[in-house]
Amino acid sequence: MLLLTLESSCDETSAAVVRDGRQVLSNVIASQIDVHALYGGVVPELASRKHMEAVAVVVDDALRQARVALGDIEGIAVTRGPGLVGALLVGLSMAKAMAMSLDIPLVGVHHMEGHILAPLLEQDVPFPYLALAVSGGHTHLYRVDGIGRYRIVGRTLDDAAGEAFDKVSKLLGLGYPGGAVIDRLAAEGNPKAFDFPRPLLKKPNFDFSFSGIKTALLYYAQSQKGPIEGDHLRDVAASFQQAVVEVLCKKTLRAARETGLQRIVVAGGVACNKGLRRMMGERSAKEGFQVFFPSPGLCADNAAMLGVAGDAYLAGGCTSDLDLNARSNWPLDQAGWPQPCR
């Protein structure tokens, strides 16, 4: 099946063409980072306006790069949620209009479902596996038994890991978004320079907490007489990142051991983090687990990642009606098969 996919849940407008749920023919992303960087975070109203300006352009670009005509498209998959309602509605409106005008099936897909299935676009990852979904809005562990079959194993109790990176970056005067900047500084710093807390590591569950690490760094910054810069800044960034990454790795590996799952997928925007990729890779190999990451281009929000689930749902006859609406809050374990049909 030749599928057109649309993503507009936050601050990236994306369209892709995916064949048979695995072959990415194009994946076009229009980023809004420069717009929101001025405000230190995503402004929902601005995000919606920028999506409206970009959505038709990215669709045209995706079709052109894939070298297919609009009439060749056999189905459409679109992010239904979770995310910013106004932003989601732009993608949904475009998807529904195209599905109606072309008389082709439509299916709404969960944003994080796209992320945790993204490695399947590039690698053979047999089910079942443990997925760490880690981004600016999510830090969850899921047991993935198949497409549409997800069970929550653990979750953040407060901030998501990506949110903590962004807040700490703002606190240190590094701007928005913060993940890439901190990762770059951390590579040149001493991760043992400061001992920031590792919350919940001694708890027997698989839940996360990152607000304590962020608060500890805030108190440290307030205790300094001058600005944190130079080698000092690099050491603070490295120590903060080390604390976050260590919590993510230890909790994930503990969950893998106790669930008996031998394969681990790490996905979402924070999966681009070089420190996380290195530590998870080394520790997983040491304990005999296979770990899979999407390539960096499939870690950030993108439309191609919707192709895996979208193709499977449509091939199975699971379609959405044209009255499909956005869901700003939508637990993934309530979004699998046959939920897109409802």
Swiss-Prot record:
Cross-referenced PANTHER family? TRNA N6-ADENOSINE THREONYLCARBAMOYLTRANSFERASE, TRNA N6-ADENOSINE THREONYLCARBAMOYLTRANSFERASE, MITOCHONDRIAL
Q: Name one Pfam family in it.
A: TsaD
Q: Where does substrate bind?
A: 133-137, 166, 179, 183, 273
The species is: Syntrophotalea carbinolica (strain DSM 2380 / NBRC 103641 / GraBd1)
Q: How is the cofactor bound?
A: Binds 1 Fe(2+) ion per subunit.
Output the Gene Ontology cellular-component terms: cytoplasm
Its family?
Belongs to the KAE1 / TsaD family.
Q: State the needed cofactors, names only.
A: Fe(2+)
Asked if the record carries the keyword Hydrolase, the reply is no
Q: Which domain of life is it from?
A: Bacteria
Keyword check for Nucleotidyltransferase? no
What are the alphabetically sorted keywords of the record?
Acyltransferase, Cytoplasm, Iron, Metal-binding, Transferase, tRNA processing
The residues forming a coiled coil are none
Q: List the catalysed reactions.
A: L-threonylcarbamoyladenylate + adenosine(37) in tRNA = N(6)-L-threonylcarbamoyladenosine(37) in tRNA + AMP + H(+)
Q: Which gene encodes it?
A: tsaD
Residues at which Fe cation binds? 111, 115, 301
Instruction: Name the job this protein performs.
Output: Required for the formation of a threonylcarbamoyl group on adenosine at position 37 (t(6)A37) in tRNAs that read codons beginning with adenine. Is involved in the transfer of the threonylcarbamoyl moiety of threonylcarbamoyl-AMP (TC-AMP) to the N6 group of A37, together with TsaE and TsaB. TsaD likely plays a direct catalytic role in this reaction.
Q: What is its EC number?
A: 2.3.1.234
Q: Where in the cell is it found?
A: Cytoplasm
Enumerate the GO terms in the molecular function aspect: iron ion binding; N(6)-L-threonylcarbamoyladenine synthase activity
Q: Which GO terms describe its biological process?
A: tRNA threonylcarbamoyladenosine modification
What's the protein called, per UniProt? tRNA N6-adenosine threonylcarbamoyltransferase
